[in-house]
Amino acid sequence: VLNNLKATFYGFKDDRKADDINNLWSLFEVALALADNDTEDNRQKFSEAYDKVHDQLCIRWNITMGLYWIRPYTFINLDSRNRWFIADAQNMPGKFVVAAEKKLKKVPYAADYLEIKDLCKKALDAGEYEYKNFPDLSYTAWVVSEQVNQEKSSEKDKKISKAEFLKWFMPLLQALRDLG
């Protein structure tokens, strides 16, 4: 889920470079071409456009979200939930987790992004998981992370803070003071 405060892929006019928006459109076009026809030539064009956009102002993990939005069955969204989910060997094969671990620490350049995408797709195509494609994976990551967050929240609510516990002793302490 994208934070509305970071919903754009470019900086304000005074902050961005003259070709930032054109670079985004170029990436959009070559991403569609790659999704429709995965060839070495299209991968090369995609890589050049992606790497150019990668270093632009306001580009972080959101670039992977944008790719996912235009072709969700081709491009993986590497938002924080998906990264958390696919970095866990309970959710993805151990080989994948090891191969992707370092690449998920910072926004990957095109070569690493395509490798993560390809390895993840290969793991999903193997059919060992209930999620069979990137949209299913994203949905499952969202559901599981919500469950984990709710469990953490309920555990936190169950714990009584020491300050809360001490409030019960205030009347007793006051009575002892009054007795002298």
PLM regions and their residue ranges:
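An N-terminal alpha-helical hairpin/helix-loop-helix interaction module that forms a charged
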Residues: 1-56, 72-179
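Short hydrophobic alpha-helical segments that form membrane-spanning helices or hydrophobic packing faces
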Residues: 63-70
